[in-house]
Curated annotation (Swiss-Prot):
Source taxonomy: Eukaryota, Fungi, Dikarya, Ascomycota, Pezizomycotina
Gene source species: Ajellomyces capsulatus (strain NAm1 / WU24) (Darling's disease fungus)
Coiled-coil region(s): none
Domain of life the protein comes from: Eukaryota
One matching Pfam family: LMBR1
Record's bilayer topology term: Multi-pass membrane protein
Any one GO CC term of the record: vacuolar membrane
Membrane-crossing residue ranges in chain numbering: 8-28, 46-66, 94-114, 145-165, 190-210, 314-334, 348-367, 376-396, 421-441, 508-528
Record keywords, A-Z: Cobalamin, Cobalt, Lysosome, Membrane, Transmembrane, Transmembrane helix, Transport
Example of a GO MF term: cobalamin binding
The protein, known as: Probable lysosomal cobalamin transporter
Ranges for region Disordered: 567-590
InterPro entries in UniProt: LMBD1_LysCbl_Transport (IPR050854), LMBR1-like_membr_prot (IPR006876)
Compartments in which it is found: Lysosome membrane
Length: 590
C-alpha cells in the first residue's frame, strides 16, 4: 500500500512536469521575436524555466510523501512507517531537491550566460563565408563565461569555509530540531550558502517585479487597454488626420507648392506633418482591417468567441483579484506572526516554531492536503499566479540597470538576449518564491502538512499513544512540541528543513529574506492603488513603431496573415511563404 501510494504521488509529479514543459514552451514562443529565433536560446530557456518550476512544484510531493507516514485522524504513525522507511522517503526527496537546486544554480550561473555570449558571438557574414567555425564561436563565448565560472567557484569556496552559526551563541536553540539544522558537512554547507545567496538576490528581484505584477495582473485583465479599432480611437484618428491635412494645405498654399520657399521653421513643420499623416493613415487602415469581416472562418469564430466570453474575462479578473488579496493578507499575517512570535528572532532568520495567527491560504492548503492531489492542483495554480505576476512585472517595468531600461519583454518582440536575461531573473525569482511560499504564504503546510500527533502518554513504553475518544488531544505537529512522542511521529518536509538550515546557519540571509516581505507587501499595495485609479491607454508610439517595422517586413498584408503569424509564434512552425529576414539581415539563428 505504501509503495502504491508513493508511486502514484510521483506519477502525478511526472504529469505536472510534462505540463511545465508545455507552459515554458508556450511562454517562450509567444514572447520571442520570430525573425530572431535561435534554436539554442529557445532550448536553454525552455529547459531552464521547466527546471525551476519543477523545483518549486516538488513541495506538494514532499508534503504528500512525509504526510503519508502518519494518520492525521489518529495522530500516530501508520504501521508500515518505521523509522527506516521514513528515512528512505526523506533521503529520496533530499536527492531530488539537491539535484534540482544544483541544476538551477548551474543553469543560472553558467549555462544561460554561456548561451548569451554564444548568441552574441554569431557573425552572419563570417558564418556564410566559413571563417567563423564552431570552435571559434565556442571559444569566443567561453572566454566571457570564464568570469561566471570563477564566480561560481568562489561562491562555493566561500560557502565551504565560511563560519556558521553556533548554538552557544543562541540560547533558544537547544531543541533537537534546531540542533539538527546546524550543518557540519562542508559540501552540504557550500551548497546551502550558495543557494542562500541566490535566494537572497532573488528576493530583491522578487520584491521589485513580482510585487508589481501581483498588483497589475488582475487589474489589467479587468481594465484592458482599448484596441486600435475602438470607435473612440478611430474617431480621434480621423479628426487628427483631417486637421493635419488642413494644416498642410495652408502651408502649401503659402509656398505655391514649392516647400523650398517656406521659412526653415515652417518647412520642418511641413515635414513633420507629412510623417504624422503617414502614421495616421496607417492607423486608419489597420483599424478598418480589424473591423472588416475576414475571409478566414477561424478568425471570425475567434472574434465571436471573444465577444461571447468577454464577461468571463471580467469574472476571471475579479477572481484573480480576490486571490491576490487573499495571498497579500496571508503574507501579512504570517510576517506579523514571525515578527512577534519567532523564538529566536534575528538569530535564526525569524524561524516560526508554531503558527499562532490564522493564515487563510495556509488553512486551505493544510485541509486540502488530506485528499491528494487537491492541494497539488491548488498549489500549481498558486505558483502559476506568482509566475505570471513576475512576467507581467518584468514586461511592465522592463529589464533595467538602475533607472536605465536595457531590454523590454513584449509579446512577439523580445530579442534572444532579453529572453535569456528574463530567464535568469525568473530563476532567481522562483528560488525566492520557494522561500516565500514555504516560509510566509503557507508555513504550516510547507513544514508538516496535515500531520498531527496524539498528545497523550502511551499505555506502555515503546508503544504509540492512543487518542481514541480523546480527539481534543490530537494536535498539529510543530517544532515546539514538548511531547517526546511528537518527534517520533512528526516528520518535517525536506524543503522546510533545507530553508530553515539556510536561515539558521547564515542568519543574515534570513533577516534580509524576512524583512523583504514587508517591502513586497508595501510595494504591491502602492502599485495596486495607483493602477486601480488609472485608466489604461493604448501605447500609440509603440504601436506605430511596431506597425511600421511590420509593414517594412511585409507582415501586414492582411488581417488573416497577422493571425497566422500569431499562430506561428505559439506553435513554433514557420509558414510556407518565403521567410523574411530580420532587421539585422538574418533569419533563424542557431
Amino acid at each position: 500500500m505504501a509503495l502504491l501510494q508513493s508511486s502514484l504521488i510521483w506519477v502525478v509529479y511526472a504529469i505536472v512536469f510534462f505540463l511545465l514543459v508545455a507552459v515554458s514552451s508556450i511562454f517562450i514562443y509567444i514572447y520571442q521575436t520570430p525573425s530572431e529565433r535561435s534554436t539554442y536560446v529557445t532550448t536553454v530557456c525552455i529547459f531552464t524555466l521547466t527546471a525551476l518550476l519543477a523545483t518549486v512544484l516538488l513541495l506538494p510531493v514532499d508534503v504528500a510523501l512525509v504526510s503519508s507516514t502518519t494518520s492525521s485522524r489518529e495522530g500516530r504513525r501508520k504501521s508500515w512507517a518505521t523509522q527506516d522507511e521514513v528515512d528512505k522517503i526523506t533521503f529520496s526527496l533530499a536527492v531530488a531537491y539537491y539535484f534540482l537546486y544544483s541544476l538551477d544554480a548551474v543553469l543560472c550561473l553558467l549555462v544561460v550566460p554561456f548561451t548569451y555570449f554564444w548568441y552574441e558571438e554569431y557573425d552572419e557574414v563570417a558564418s556564410e563565408d566559413g571563417s567563423q567555425t564552431f570552435r571559434k564561436r565556442f571559444w569566443g563565448a567561453f572566454k566571457y563565461t570564464v568570469a561566471f565560472i570563477l564566480l561560481t567557484v568562489i561562491l562555493f569556496l566561500v560557502g565551504f569555509f565560511v563560519p556558521i552559526g553556533r548554538r552557544k551563541d543562541k540560547p533558544n536553540l537547544d531543541l533537537d530540531y534546531f540542533r539538527r539544522l546546524l550543518t557540519e558537512n562542508h559540501g552540504e554547507r557550500a551548497l546551502t550558502f550558495a543557494l542562500g545567496l541566490l535566494i537572497t538576490i532573488g528576493i530583491l528581484v522578487y520584491v521589485l517585479y513580482t510585487s508589481t505584477g501581483l498588483a497589475l495582473l488582475p487589474v489589467t485583465i479587468i481594465k484592458s487597454a482599448p484596441a486600435i479599432s475602438s470607435p473612440t480611437l478611430s474617431a480621434n484618428t480621423a479628426s487628427r488626420l483631417e486637421e493635419n491635412i488642413e494644416r498642410q494645405r495652408q502651408l502649401e498654399g503659402r509656398c505655391g507648392g514649392n516647400p523650398d520657399r517656406l521659412p526653415s521653421k515652417q518647412r520642418r513643420e511641413l515635414d513633420s506633418l507629412v510623417r504624422q499623416a503617414r502614421t495616421l493613415r496607417r492607423r486608419q487602415r489597420l483599424a478598418e482591417e480589424a473591423r472588416r469581416p475576414s475571409g478566414s472562418w477561424l478568425l471570425n469564430a475567434w472574434f465571436k468567441l471573444s465577444a461571447v466570453f468577454r464577461p468571463l474575462k471580467l469574472l476571471s479578473g475579479l477572481l484573480l483579484l480576490a486571490i491576490a488579496m487573499l495571498v497579500w493578507v496571508s503574507m501579512l499575517l504570517t510576517s506579523i506572526d514571525k515578527a512577534m512570535n519567532s523564538i529566536c528572532k534575528q538569530n535564526c532568520g525569524y524561524i516560526l516554531g508554531k503558527t499562532n495567527i490564522l493564515n487563510p491560504i495556509n488553512w486551505v492548503f493544510v485541509h486540502s492536503s488530506k485528499v491528494f492531489p487537491v492541494d497539488y492542483i491548488l498549489f500549481v495554480f498558486l505558483v502559476l499566479v506568482f509566475f505570471c505576476s513576475s512576467v507581467v512585472g518584468i514586461a511592465t517595468t522592463g529589464i533595467r540597470f538602475l533607472w536605465v531600461r536595457i531590454f523590454q519583454l513584449r509579446k512577439g518582440h523580445t530579442s534572444p538576449q532579453a529572453l535569456l536575461i528574463t530567464t535568469v531573473m525568473l530563476t532567481l525569482i522562483t528560488l525566492a518564491l520557494n522561500y516565500s511560499i514555504s516560509m510566509v504564504v503557507a508555513p504550516q503546510y510547507a513544514t508538516y502538512g496535515p500531520q498531527t500527533f496524539c498528545d497523550h502518554p502511551p499505555k506502555h513504553p515503546g508503544e504509540q499513544p492512543d487518542c481514541t475518544g480523546l480527539e481534543p488531544l490530537i494536535k498539529p505537529c510543530s517544532e515546539l512540541s514538548e511531547n517526546p512522542t511528537a518527534k517520533e511521529i512528526c516528520t518535517p518536509t525536506v524543503v522546510s528543513t533545507f530553508l530553515n538550515r539556510i536561515t539558521l546557519n547564515f542568519p543574515f540571509f534570513g533577516i534580509v529574506d524576512f524583512w523583504a516581505q514587508f517591502f513586497f507587501l508595501g510595494l504591491s499595495l502602492l502599485v495596486f492603488l495607483v493602477t486601480i485609479f488609472r485608466t489604461p491607454k493604448l501605447d500609440e508610439q509603440q504601436f506605430d513603431e511596431d506597425a511600421e517595422a511590420a509593414e517594412e517586413e511585409g507582415l501586414l498584408a492582411s488581417t488573416g496573415r497577422r493571425f497566422g503569424a500569431t499562430w506561428e509564434d505559439i506553435t513554433g512552425r514557420a509558414s510556407r511563404s518565403p521567410q523574411v529576414s530580420g532587421s539585422a539581415g538574418r533569419g533563424t539563428r542557431e
